[in-house]
Amino acid sequence: MAAKDVVFGGEARARMVEGVNILANAVKVTLGPKGRNVVLERSFGAPTVTKDGVSVAKEIELKDKLQNMGAQMVKEVASKTSDNAGDGTTTATVLAQAIVREGMKYVAAGMNPMDLKRGIDKAVVSLVEQLKKQSKPTTTSKEIAQVGTISANSDDDVGQIIASAMDKVGKEGVITVEDGKSLNNELDVVEGMQFDRGYLSPYFINNPEKQSAVLDNPFVLLYDKKISNIRDLLPTLEQVAKSGRPLLIIAEEVEGEALATLVVNTIRGILKVVAVKAPGFGDRRKAMLEDIAILTGGKVIAEEVGLTLEKVTLADLGQAKRVEVGKENTTIIDGAGAAGDIEARVKQVRVQIEEATSDYDREKLQERVAKLAGGVAVIKVGAATEVEMKEKKARVEDALHATRAAVEEGIVAGGGVALLRAKQAAGAIKGDNADQDAGIKLILRAIEEPLRIIVTNAGDEASVVVNAVLAGKGNYGYNAANGTYGDMIEMGILDPTKVTRTALQNAASVAALMLTTEAMVAESPKDDAPAGGMPGGMGGMGGMGMDM
């Protein structure tokens, strides 16, 4: 086991604070409408240019082990805030730095760090309460666009495209971000339910231009096993042929003789059929088949519920207005399922989302809700170069998370104003002793920091602006983009409540841990081996002069 260095007291905290400052100073240059970019080296390819706080924080590793520990703890603040709220990473980092800086003064003056921590916790609970009181729900598309714009570093176009995506697929809908092919951002909306399985044979194609199979007003057969014997399918095919309508078959697999017969019948024009593999795997496949059954008003033909292929009637089949099957995707538009059944299914899946333990499961369940509830929107990000594309895509994803957070918990005035108003509304928070009072005081001082940094990055005098904003009331604040004062919400400068709340809670939590640190343990730096001279055994090389 490698030898360890143990550092105590003031020296340990001082080294940790150095690390905090290095990371926070690199991150905070990106804050506000006039924040600057940070360029990140890549081991191969072009460097990445970003204005996203968490991307900068994640890149930072310091050589000094103790400094690095401080930096990593603040990095944790940024990534936790990003995971929970999707945005506000720079605000969280700036708050953490300010709390540590103010707190270290009190610790150095001999105050009890544990009481300081208790004071910090009391102040945060009170401030969060005030933020919730200030919060107002997002109702209009305009507000959603404004939240997106602010989060995307004042890019209007991004805010608008996210708002129109939410308009089209609903606030619960799935919105994904992809690389675009042109210079401009584009929005594609897929209505109905889409899943990532295409036709099993290209002979099913009936729309050569789009290379897809389109079925109008089809029946939908859902089967949870393989179909390889055509005899099992014959009764269903005969009933569908009599009705004169097309048929979509979704099964675990359609193969061999069954697939060949379906293809031959389609080519001859006897029956219009398309066969598709069922989406998902294992239990998720069963759940998705059940979703499609509810959406189309049909049943999943499964032996465990006593249904077999031979006994299927038209009443067991689902129906839809239109189905489009491409090489890789199938879209069911306007299924015939009852609205009440679909709503009940959505509620059931939402309960599962709340109980889900892994992010992956939660994401998949949310996709299912969206597919049942409305549709899927794809934002295609356009840019001139790959470097710009990466930077823009990261901003669009941030903005999307921020708008989701705004829909979830509402909005407050942006530009650091909400925290100042929370401080004023909280009034006199009292601790149990003088040291706790100091902890409360340091938080109330530290929450001015986001506004100070926004103003500093815009090239103005921070103290003057903070005092002017504190003298105002309500949403009155400072618009750093053009140097004017006014109502932040009217000017469209909004922050999601969840983002501001999460940033404050995470920053205070980690900063309080740093203040209560008394010892640090890190691996001792390895001594470099002395450089060796030339290896021996090279003597006897004299007398090599040449007589000319």
From Swiss-Prot:
The lineage of its organism: Bacteria, Pseudomonadati, Pseudomonadota, Betaproteobacteria, Burkholderiales. GO terms for biological process: protein refolding. Together with its co-chaperonin GroES, plays an essential role in assisting protein folding. The GroEL-GroES system forms a nano-cage that allows encapsulation of the non-native substrate proteins and provides a physical environment optimized to promote and accelerate protein folding. InterPro entries: Chaperonin_Cpn60_CS (IPR018370), Cpn60/GroEL (IPR001844), Cpn60/GroEL/TCP-1 (IPR002423), GroEL-like_apical_dom_sf (IPR027409), GROEL-like_equatorial_sf (IPR027413), TCP-1-like_intermed_sf (IPR027410). Its EC number is 5.6.1.7. ATP binds at residues 30-33, 51, 87-91, 415, 479-481, 495. Forms a cylinder of 14 subunits composed of two heptameric rings stacked back-to-back. Interacts with the co-chaperonin GroES. Belongs to the chaperonin (HSP60) family. The gene is groEL. GO terms for molecular function: ATP binding; ATP-dependent protein folding chaperone; isomerase activity; unfolded protein binding. Its main location: cytoplasm. Keywords: ATP-binding, Chaperone, Cytoplasm, Isomerase, Nucleotide-binding. This is Chaperonin GroEL. NCBIfam families: GroEL (TIGR02348), PRK00013.1 (NF000592), PRK12849.1 (NF009487), PRK12850.1 (NF009488), PRK12851.1 (NF009489). GO terms for cellular component: cytoplasm. It comes from Methylibium petroleiphilum (strain ATCC BAA-1232 / LMG 22953 / PM1). SUPFAM superfamilies: GroEL apical domain-like (SSF52029), GroEL equatorial domain-like (SSF48592), GroEL-intermediate domain like (SSF54849). CDD domains: GroEL.
